[in-house]
């Protein structure tokens, strides 16, 4: 999610009026959701089947991978571009375009693919499920993605706390080497490709691509200034693409079933299937693969068993992980779960980690806790983030008690705007957006709490 820079500053294209004529063009899809089982890419999401090589092959992994590799980088990039796949780590940048930055004449330096498995966003656990239950999808995805970029090797940077997941991944890599699927002459294609696992040490900031690269190199995980971008100077000073686990893992299936198949799901510019995490006040917290642009209400009601106490008991939802602004129940009624629809709703898809809060939630305290997290995880390199997030944390602690004045709400908003967009990476943005969402939708609750505190304070003084 640290890659999700300036999402709220984006704009949607103007609405286009459609005229129906007598041609045979199929009408645009208007309803989304209810993904069929045969269209699911992640078929072992809940670990009900064997995750090792034989089990993975029985579910279609490593099928005709040699043919995909032999078709070459241009063909793979063409299918990924046709699919409309956008980065699944939060930023939503077109994957085919990003990968094509690496597909240029070599200057003698090796190229690398780095997979960001440092999943530290509160509420997010989709990549963990892929690595734990479907590790071969990721390993095969590294090979296919690496071939598209002309990469020599892939480094999978995995969160240090994911001990069991790292173990499963290492087993899957060993099995792939022993079967000749990766390494020298991978899959018999004549293409050499290695895969390495690098364990992180728990720093959230290493989810930012350049901080992750610094960590791989053995340095302190602090974001780099850009340019130069990783595609020019990345890990070990070589051209590098950093990609999310889910983004990489879906690429072999896109190549096998065709980019047009993947593009048939979701709205235009928001195509494909997506893993959604649903947690919080729901009857059945889960991770589920669903079509992009599925209505948020349907996602919660159908897959998570609904809000505890019923839909009318819903207070607010954080739709894309802790760094995206919350939206109230009134917006949740109709909003679609895709990049553009959520930007229009003044929030973002982020990592698609849906955090549901019912009416029992102290919404001010919940957001204050998130700000405390970002204050703790700031690397301290940028002054607006280091000082501003610490200041916001102190103010939010007083807002929880109500020990503040209404004018301070505007001050907090202004500080959040001064942090947003003024830092090297997007951690400052991720800390500012939850505060902005709270003020935008729950300002009356903040003012009421301050009023109650003032009345109680006056009553105590009168008692003396």
From Swiss-Prot:
Record-listed N6-acetyllysine modification sites: 81, 104, 375
Keywords per UniProt: 4Fe-4S, Acetylation, Electron transport, Flavoprotein, FMN, Iron, Iron-sulfur, Membrane, Metal-binding, Methylation, Mitochondrion, Mitochondrion inner membrane, NAD, Oxidoreductase, Respiratory chain, Transit peptide, Translocase, Transport, Ubiquinone
Presequence positions on this chain: 1-20
GO cellular component labels: mitochondrial inner membrane; respiratory chain complex I
One GO-annotated biological process of the protein: mitochondrial electron transport, NADH to ubiquinone
Residues that, per the record, bind NADH: 87-96
GO molecular function, one term: FMN binding
Cofactor: FMN; [4Fe-4S] cluster
Domain of life, per lineage: Eukaryota
Broad class of where this protein is predominantly found: mitochondrion
Free-text comment on the cofactor: Binds 1 FMN.
Membrane topology of the entry: Peripheral membrane protein
Location(s), subcellular: Mitochondrion inner membrane
N6-succinyllysine, modified sites: 81
Annotated PANTHER family: NADH DEHYDROGENASE [UBIQUINONE] FLAVOPROTEIN 1, MITOCHONDRIAL (PTHR11780:SF10), NADH-UBIQUINONE OXIDOREDUCTASE FLAVOPROTEIN 1 NDUFV1 (PTHR11780)
Protein name: NADH dehydrogenase [ubiquinone] flavoprotein 1, mitochondrial
Species this protein is from: Bos taurus
């Amino acid at each position: 999610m640290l890659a999700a820079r300036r999402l709220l500053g984006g704009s949607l294209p103007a609405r286009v009026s459609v005229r129906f004529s007598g041609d045979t063009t199929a009408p645009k899809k208007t309803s989304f959701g209810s993904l069929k089982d045969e269209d699911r890419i992640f078929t072992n999401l809940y670990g009900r089947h064997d995750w090792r090589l034989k089990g993975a092959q029985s579910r279609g992994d490593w099928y005709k991978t040699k043919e995909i590799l032999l078709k070459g980088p241009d063909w793979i990039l063409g299918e990924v571009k046709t699919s409309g796949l956008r980065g699944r780590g939060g930023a939503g940048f077109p994957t085919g375009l990003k990968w094509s930055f690496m597909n240029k004449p070599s200057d003698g330096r090796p190229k690398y693919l780095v997979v960001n498995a440092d999943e530290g966003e509160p509420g997010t656990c989709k990549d963990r499920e892929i690595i734990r239950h479907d590790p071969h999808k990721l390993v095969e995805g590294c090979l296919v993605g690496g071939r598209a970029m002309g990469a020599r090797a892939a480094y999978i940077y995995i969160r240090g706390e994911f001990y069991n997941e790292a173990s499963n991944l290492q087993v899957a890599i060993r099995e792939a080497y022993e079967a000749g699927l990766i390494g020298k002459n991978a899959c018999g294609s004549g293409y050499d490709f290695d895969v390495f696992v690098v364990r992180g040490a728990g720093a959230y900031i290493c989810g930012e691509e350049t901080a992750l690269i610094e960590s791989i190199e053995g340095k302190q995980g602090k974001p780099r200034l850009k340019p130069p971008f990783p595609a020019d100077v990345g890990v070990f000073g070589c051209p590098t693409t950093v990609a999310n686990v889910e983004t990489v893992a879906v690429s072999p299936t896109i190549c096998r079933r065709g980019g047009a198949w993947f593009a048939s799901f979701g709205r235009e510019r928001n195509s494909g299937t997506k893993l959604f995490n649903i947690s919080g006040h729901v009857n059945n917290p889960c991770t589920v693969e669903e079509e992009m642009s599925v209505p948020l209400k349907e996602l919660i009601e159908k897959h998570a068993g609904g809000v505890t106490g019923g839909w009318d008991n819903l207070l607010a939802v954080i739709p894309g992980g802790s760094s995206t602004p919350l939206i109230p129940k009134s917006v949740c009624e109709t909003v679609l779960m895709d990049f553009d629809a959520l930007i229009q709703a003044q929030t973002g898809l982020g990592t698609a980690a849906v955090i549901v809060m019912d009416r029992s939630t102290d919404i001010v305290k919940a957001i204050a806790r998130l700000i405390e997290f970002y204050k703790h995880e700031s690397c301290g390199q940028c002054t607006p983030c280091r000082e501003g997030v610490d200041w916001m944390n102190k103010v939010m602690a007083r807002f929880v008690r109500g020990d503040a004045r209404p004018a301070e709400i505007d001050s907090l908003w202004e500080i959040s705007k001064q942090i947003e967009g003024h830092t090297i990476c997007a951690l400052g943005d991720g800390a500012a957006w939850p505060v902005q969402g709270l003020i935008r939708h729950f300002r009356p609750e903040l003012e009421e709490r301050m009023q109650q505190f003032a009345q109680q304070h006056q009553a105590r003084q009168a008692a003396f």
